[in-house]
Amino acid sequence: MKALYLGHAAVLLQTGERNILIDPFINENPSCPIKVQDLPKIHYILVTHGHGDHLGDTVEIAKRDSSTVITNFELSSLISRHGISTHPMHIGGRYTFEFGSVKLTPALHGSSISEGDTPVYAGNPCGFLIEIHDKKIYHAGDTGLTKDMELLRRENIDLAFLPIGGNFVMDLWDAVEAVKMIYPEIVVPIHYNTWEVIKSDPAIFQKEVEKLGLKCRALKPGESIEL
C-alpha cells in the first residue's frame, strides 16, 4: 500500500485495488502538485470536517468517479444534496468497507460549510483510524492536543498523519506530545506552511520525534511512503 501526500492535509491511499482520498483540497491548494484532473479514479473519499481546505473538491471528484464519501452524519446530509453517494458515521463508530475498516476518532476543532456569507453547522470534526491489509493508518484531521489520543496507543498504529501548523491546530510541540501518546511506527507531519499563519518547521518536528526512537518522514507534496 502506498500513501501519497498531496500537501496541506490531503492524502491518497492506494491499495492496488482501491484508491482512498482523504481531505481532497486539490485545485485551490497552493501546495498541491496536481489538479483534480490528474487524479486516478477515486473509489472512496474520507472528509474530516466541513472547512473548505478539507472538504475541498469532494463533490467534483465524487460526481466524476461515483465515489462514496465517508464523513460525519451532518456533513454527509449536507453534501448528499449534490447527488453523490455518502456513508454517514459518527465519533467512535467503526465500519468495514470493501477496502478495510474505518473508525472515526475525536478531533478538537470546528466544522462548518459556507452558504453565501453564512457558516452552516457541519457536525463534529473527526480523525480517521483506517485499517487496510493489516496496516493501521491514523489521520488526525484538524485538532488540538487531546488526552483521547492516549487511547490510540493500543491500536499499534503503523503510520500517523499529524498537523503541526499551530493557530488552527496543534503546533509542532503539541504534536510531539501527541506522538508520545500514540507511539506510531512512522509519523508524517501535515497541515503546515500552506499559508503564513500555519508556518512551522518540519525539520524540528522530525528531530524531536527521532529523539523518541521513532521514525518521522517530512514528506514534500507529491512524495509517498510505502507500507
UniProtKB/Swiss-Prot annotation:
GO molecular function: hydrolase activity
InterPro entries: Metallo-B-lactamas, RibonucZ/Hydroxyglut_hydro, UPF0173, UPF0173_UPF0282_UlaG_hydrolase
Keywords attached to this entry: Hydrolase
Superkingdom field: Bacteria
NCBIfam families from the UniProt entry: PRK00685.1
Assigned protein family: Belongs to the UPF0173 family.
Record protein name field: UPF0173 metal-dependent hydrolase Tlet_1100
